[in-house]
Design a protein with these regions (language model features):
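Short, low-complexity Pro/Thr/Gly
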Residues: 1-402
Length: 402
């Protein structure tokens, strides 16, 4: 039989391979979930701290660390409001309060991770936005509507009604659905994976390393929306679920020999959230030196109301408005990306913004894949305006992956 090409090599179909067996995994003997309780009291606004001791021979599976909370929303009437005079009412029985989307993560504005007392997570005060944007762009509709994201109280807001409270004439249906979970003072349980760089890589953490986590609370005015009351979230119980793996003695000895000569390597994809204030009344703004040093793989830009960002009970913090933007250009090392600036039109009469919308796919590496993010073309202009740019694809001509 002649070959298709002289450089083509011969192969064997797996259907004809009768004499080999699949390999057997022996390096990990077993694993189990361990629950850790916080070492601090669960005060209203106090940070929550966890410590995972590094003693023993078990390794930690960092990708499977999860936070579990049980909370209750307590509501009081605004001074001079229409309340009945009671000082505290279980959430939602007399006053209507709505939790914002992705509540488990919206409750925190910063998460610090320490390995042996050394900070390994970049400091920032916008963790809620990082978690929201990653979930919004990296998961398709099934994960958001019927799978694990609902465990974090993810319920995608209705476009065009992002700020419409439950007691509005036309309320946001997603707010209504989320409000049912805390109606009449019902306790709500939440669980989910934490969006931290060290938890987004596959390597186990070796033994002998103490892990300390510090979770800083967001303002209640940031994660609760309401009109005639002031509510607060009270954390009833908190647990950190950690998967510990028992490693075979041979692997432990081999690792110990290598660690006597060198250090363990943990390559990370670092995610940073940077915030800038654009003053009201300006028709144009140029922001220089946004990133100094190492070039980012990907940049995602969104615009929110400053009051919502800082916590306003009547505004949705995740309402990424278009603000009438008609020109957007990004420069990296003096090179414009893309070569022609984005010039969308968000006019009601003649909306033209498909190139900006398409960046949600080209900028996240899924534009040629059978994947999505549940943001339709119509939804985009009504609270989901994000501009995404894949710099690796531009400079190297290859995708940087998701």
């Amino acid at each position: 039989m002649s070959f298709l090409h002289t450089h083509s090599s011969e192969c064997l179909k797996s259907e004809l391979d009768f004499f080999s067996l699949p390999p057997t995994q022996t390096s990990i003997e077993s694993s189990q979930w361990i629950y850790y309780k916080p070492i601090t009291s669960l005060g209203d606004d106090a940070p929550i701290e966890f410590v995972i001791p590094g003693h023993g021979e078990d390794y930690l599976d960092l990708t499977h660390i999860m936070l579990s909370l049980r909370i209750r929303v307590e509501t009081s009437p605004l001074a001079g409001g229409d309340g009945d005079g009671e000082t505290s009412t279980p959430g939602g029985s007399a006053f209507k309060v709505d939790p914002v989307n992705h509540l488990l993560h919206s409750m925190f504005n910063q998460i610090d991770v320490y390995f042996n007392q050394k900070l390994v997570s970049p400091p920032n005060n916008a963790y809620a936005y990082r978690a929201y944007i990653e979930a919004l762009l990296n998961y398709s509709s099934p994960a958001k509507t019927s799978h694990h994201l609902t465990s974090c109280l993810w319920d995608m807001d209705t476009p065009g009604l992002m700020d419409a409270l439950v007691d509005s004439e036309t309320p946001n249906p997603a707010l209504v659905r989320r409000a049912r979970y805390i109606h009449e003072g019902h306790a709500l349980d939440l669980i989910g994976h934490l969006y931290c760089d060290v938890f987004n890589q596959d390597k186990f953490l070796i033994n002998g390393v103490e892990v300390r986590m510090r979770l800083v609370r967001s303002k209640d005015s940031f994660c609760l929306m309401e009109n005639t009351s002031t509510s607060k979230i009270r954390i009833l119980d908190a647990s950190l679920l950690v998967k510990r793996a028992k490693i075979s003695p041979g692997i432990l000895l081999a690792h110990a020999r290598m660690l006597s000569k060198t250090t363990a390597k943990y390559p990370l994809t670092r995610v940073e959230v940077k915030t800038f204030t654009i003053h009201a009344g300006l028709v144009g703004e140029s922001i220089d030196n946004v990133i100094l040093g190492q070039l980012s793989k990907r940049i995602i830009v969104g615009f929110v109301d400053n009051r919502a960002f800082n916590g306003d009970r009547k505004l949705n913090p995740f309402n990424f408005k278009n603000y009438g933007i008609n020109f957007f250009s990004l420069y990296a090392d003096g090179i414009q990306i893309p070569s022609r600036p984005l010039q969308p039109s968000f006019s009601r009469d003649e909306p033209l913004y498909v190139e900006a919308y398409h960046t949600l796919f080209s900028g996240t590496g899924i534009h040629f894949l059978n994947e999505g993010n549940s943001i339709s073309r119509e939804y985009y202009a009504e609270g989901f305006i994000l501009f995404a740019f894949d710099l690796i694809a531009f400079f190297l001509g290859c995708t940087s992956g998701r």
